[in-house]
């Protein structure tokens, strides 16, 4: 997922180019504006964390581009491509990562990436109801 700062910062096409050049296939994509209820449901696992209200506010501050990516080892390769959560640290330790390119800090870090195959499956189904579970496991998709 390209977060609001990535979309509003006009990084969408650059990120998509990086994704394709890294060997991913963009299977599906959808530009959407999350409302509070949707953002809260998507990030439900973080609901007890102190940053949750700020995360929901941020994720509803502008449109996001949700994508389903396909590649062998998609989750781990995507995590490598986006870099560390904190964009400031990414600029030092992973200067060629997506978060180093367009992120600002640990929240406004431009992109979201599933942290596991099971998270990817849940997140893909959250936005793309027509993608069935077997397709995800077989084709090794990753929600972005």
From Swiss-Prot:
SUPFAM superfamilies: Nucleoside diphosphate kinase, NDK. It catalyses: a 2'-deoxyribonucleoside 5'-diphosphate + ATP = a 2'-deoxyribonucleoside 5'-triphosphate + ADP; a ribonucleoside 5'-diphosphate + ATP = a ribonucleoside 5'-triphosphate + ADP. It holds the Pfam family NDK. The active site is at 112 (pros-phosphohistidine intermediate). ATP binds at residues 3, 51, 79, 85, 99, 109. Disulfide bonds: none annotated. GO terms for biological process: CTP biosynthetic process; GTP biosynthetic process; UTP biosynthetic process. It is an enzyme of class 2 (transferase). Keywords: ATP-binding, Kinase, Nucleotide-binding, Transferase. Its EC number is 2.7.4.6. One of its GO terms (molecular function) is ATP binding. Involved in the synthesis of nucleoside triphosphates other than ATP. The ATP gamma phosphate is transferred to the NDP beta phosphate via a ping-pong mechanism, using a phosphorylated active-site intermediate. Belongs to the NDK family. This is Probable nucleoside diphosphate kinase 5.
